[in-house]
Amino acid sequence: RPPRSTLFPYTTLFRSLAFENNIPLVAVSHIEGHIAANYLTYPQLVPPYMCLLTSGGHTAILKVEDYNQRTLIGSTIDDAVGECFDKVARVLGLGYPGGPKIDKLAKEGKSEITFCKTPLVGTYNFSFSGVKTAVINYVHNKEQKGEGINKADVAASFQEEVCGELVKKSTRAAREYGMDKLVVAGGVSANSRLKEMLKGECEKQNISLFMPELGLCTDNAAMIGSAAYFMMKKGEGLSDTNLTASSVVKI
């Protein structure tokens, strides 16, 4: 997430614009923005629904009861999924951002390497530090032995395991909470394998799947505007000119 200091200039700018033009100033959570991106792609989408949040800083399953009203069902206890993609991409020498690079490389490989299985069963929480560490150790061990690795196979195997966990828990949550709609939000929703796996599983379970168009998956101003629109309709989020920025977002 960005340092708090980087947000201050923009907060000051928007406070000034709102004051000078006598227009509302709405405080929008980054998470609310990612969720609200789906309302731009699917105008017909209305709560309630189950939401899978997948971003660089957050991974969670949320029950969305109403616009800007949600209940946390489960979340990561260590690394966020986007962060995990970035760290694995780094050890493979792919650079940043890791998500798109692993997604592209994985198409050339086979998901035949077993790294580790998540230890969290019987819960909606996630843990990605185990598979991340397993991949890093695998690569380092091969390098120490002077053995080559097939980076495409590593990328495909890692991606398959992580996406499988996201799909399994989010669809199970939707089913067990009686939700027939699953909404996906955050930058990792752009992952092609995640889309493919979610589509297949949701079709099997008769769950309607909603994923934002590619241009709205990562951080963008439109998603913030969408969230602000629904907040203003309910008279929520209106702030005065003393609004301050925060780099820590509570799910």
Predicted regions and their residues:
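Glycine-rich phosphate-binding loops at beta-strand->alpha-helix junctions
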Residues: 179-198
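Alpha-helix C-terminal capping segments
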Residues: 15-24, 43, 176, 226-231
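A short helix-loop
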Residues: 46, 53-54, 61-150, 199-200, ...
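Adenine-nucleotide phosphate-binding core of ATP-dependent small-molecule kinases
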Residues: 121-129, 136-183
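Conserved phosphate-binding catalytic cores of ATP/NTP-utilizing and phosphoryl-transfer enzymes
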Residues: 23, 28-50, 227
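Short, acidic/small-residue loops that bind anionic groups at enzyme active sites
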Residues: 14-34, 76-78, 208-211
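Short, small-residue-biased leader/transition segments that mark boundaries at the very start
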Residues: 1-13
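Conserved phosphate-binding/catalytic loops in two-lobed NTP-binding clefts
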Residues: 27-28, 182, 199-224
